[in-house]
Amino acid sequence: MNRLKFFLLLFCVSVFLSNCASNEKIEDNKENTFEVLTYSAELSETITLDNSEIVLGKSREFKYWTKNYQNPQNNIAHIKTSAEFKNKKKIFSGSSNYINLIQPIYFEGNLCHVKKKGFLVCKKVEGKEEIINIDIKNDDIEKYEVVRGGITYFDNTIIFVDAYGQIKSIDVDNSKINWETQIDFPILSAPLIYRDQVFFISADNRIFSLSFKTGEIQWSFQTIEESKKNLFTASPVAIENIIIAPFSNGEIIAFKVDDGQPVWSENTSKISIISNFNLRDITANPVISGNSIFSLSSNGRLISNSIINGARNWNVDISGSQTPIISANQIYLIDNEARVICINKSTGEIYWIRELEKHRRGTDSKNLNLWTGPYLINEYLYLISYFGDILTISPFNGEILDEDK
């Protein structure tokens, strides 16, 4: 049995819960009607593009998943697995009356997650033997109402951060705390371990760098604080000696890993009188592919920038909260209007658009059919809805191939 089978399903559900929570303020728009090929006045397929040019990158099987979106570039691309969305088995039990925004992690056959009562629990996937069960919540609380922050693994160590400003290093072998550090603001992003440093973003729009070995703060940088933000924030990405952080005011800023010196900055939000009253947060993780970084804001644009100097390659007026998937020369994403979009990575032109069901019945918020994904698995795109539907879509033309309700 493929060990990733259980984890893949749990991962998708975890990201799905994050998607539901990130859209707590919703305004209904009853005038969203779309014509063929032009689904809005601002977004349309590029007629000159040929869908036959779409070629998927080589799929690969992941043996571990030690952070949210697997790697420091947040680029999971094309997944190869024998897992199926059938015969699902429960590894962890829990309740549905709370929100858990922390994605589980998988390493060396172990699956770890944070429970409502503030316990970090790790189990062997095969056999379900419990290897870690420790209380990591703040001493002043009984349980989490909303589980925010994140966990990541490296070198026999789990790093945990939460919305109470806690940062803890936990030894996997003996479940003991190596060190712990406290900051004054909630931590809303999952941590990133990179080059012996721990990076995360706090609610006051500050990126921190801590020593992986001691927990000592190496450097920090604060940009303009934003009062309107989602329940969670996207995580930093890194490549070579560059760490790039997405902030809740729509900014992305590149820093030198060693000393935190800013290198370049960009703003993904559309600036206008109207947009100043809306969320400009970035909840979709930026993705690094090749020499470019691709950033999607909750109320703004999808932007491609050079990693080296931040020069803008192109931008498209698309808003979304789900991390894009990049395979070969295509970007796949779902926007806030429940449209699955395939974009040319080099130019920002649109190959195809597939509109999904935005509301199940009525147009009020309780009937809003939030979608998570897409995930490119075994040459198919998969999306999961708020109501538990699983869609299978062709990555070549956007055709809906299967709908499991």
Predicted regions and their residues:
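C-terminal motif of bacterial Sec signal peptides marking the signal peptidase cleavage site
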Residues: F16-N19
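Blade/loop signatures of beta-propeller domains
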Residues: N29-E45, N51-K88
